[in-house]
């Protein structure tokens, strides 16, 4: 009996040590949709190059998802180790399984703020002067799991227009991410659409950071072609999350690497975050409680 017990314990330890070793071989990075895949992979290449030595893994693999939910499901399923999410995407994970991931950091803008805005844009040549002019028109959202591209306008636009979104607009739809949404507005698929920006600086420049600024910098958007019709209250910057079951040593090394990145490699930091950011700051789930509550009340899990 004792021999069987010892053999069973030995087998268990072998499996456990094997699982631990496997955990250290590869670090898996989820990248949410929003811009084309080639640009997303290019932005994260510095992480692929640097993290193996930092974490002691053999390789870092990038998994760009077609939409936000691809990364959400990967994190819920334990097949991703790290991702940067919008607050609503994190809320979706939290409501499904509060212990699946840990929010560890978020970004800080150069002006010290820790938030951004949902921005409603339309083609300038449509002649819309305010959001009131959009009554009975077609509205495009970025993605069902986007904070600025769906959740926040769904909750706060009714306060401006005096009616629920589905009653005020004749039709709503999704553009397939922020970049695609703006392109669809320009094509005329939607009369207006929701995207995001820092709200700092000039609209004519695409603000200092956010989707509009990225599109301007990439040469695929002329700000003279669009107008801003509405801007939301401040939205908390989304979190960097890690898989909760990731071993403690790796979590600590990864967190330290990210915290130091703005100084150790400003170019890499800028490539990942884009625009007007200066550093990271630690966060906990409590920072996102208002978004979690808003999502639970309006969308559900």
Description of each model-found segment:
Residues 24-31, 35-46, 52, 211, ...:
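An extracytoplasmic/periplasmic, membrane-proximal ligand-sensing/linker region
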Residues 33, 64-68, 78-97, 107, ...:
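Beta->alpha turn/N-cap motifs
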Residues 32-34, 117-128, 230-248:
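A bilobed periplasmic-binding-protein/Venus flytrap-type ligand-binding module shared by bacterial periplasmic
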Residues 17-21:
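Sec/Tat signal peptide C-region and signal peptidase I cleavage site
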């Amino acid at each position: 009996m004792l021999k069987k017990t010892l053999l069973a314990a030995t087998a268990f330890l072998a499996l456990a040590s094997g699982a631990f070793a496997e955990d250290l071989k590869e670090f898996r990075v989820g990248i949410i949709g929003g811009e084309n895949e080639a640009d997303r992979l290019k932005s994260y290449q510095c992480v692929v190059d640097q993290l193996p030595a930092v974490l002691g893994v053999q390789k870092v693999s990038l998994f760009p998802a077609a939409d936000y939910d691809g990364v959400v499901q990967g994190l819920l399923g334990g097949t991703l180790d790290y991702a940067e999410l919008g607050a609503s995407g994190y809320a979706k994970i939290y409501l499904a399984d509060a212990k699946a991931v840990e929010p560890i950091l978020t970004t800080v803008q150069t002006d010290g703020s820790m938030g951004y805005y949902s921005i409603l844009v339309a083609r300038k040549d449509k002649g819309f002067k305010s959001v009131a002019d959009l009554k009975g028109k077609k509205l495009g959202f970025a993605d069902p799991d986007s904070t600025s591209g769906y959740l926040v306008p769904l909750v706060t636009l009714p306060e401006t227009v005096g009616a629920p979104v589905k009653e005020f607009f004749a039709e709503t739809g999704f553009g397939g991410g922020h970049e695609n949404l703006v392109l669809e507005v320009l094509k005329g698929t939607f009369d207006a659409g929701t995207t995001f920006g820092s709200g700092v600086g000039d609209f004519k420049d695409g603000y200092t950071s956010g989707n509009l600024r990225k599109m301007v910098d990439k040469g695929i958007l002329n700000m003279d072609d669009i107008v801003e019709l509405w801007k939301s209250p401040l939205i908390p910057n989304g979190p960097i999350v890690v898989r909760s079951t990731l071993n403690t040593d790796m979590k600590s090394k990864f967190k330290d690497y990210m915290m130091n990145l703005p100084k150790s490699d400003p170019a890499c930091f800028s490539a990942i975050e884009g625009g007007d950011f200066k550093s990271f700051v630690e966060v906990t789930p409590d920072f996102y409680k208002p978004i979690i509550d808003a999502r639970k009340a309006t969308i559900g899990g």
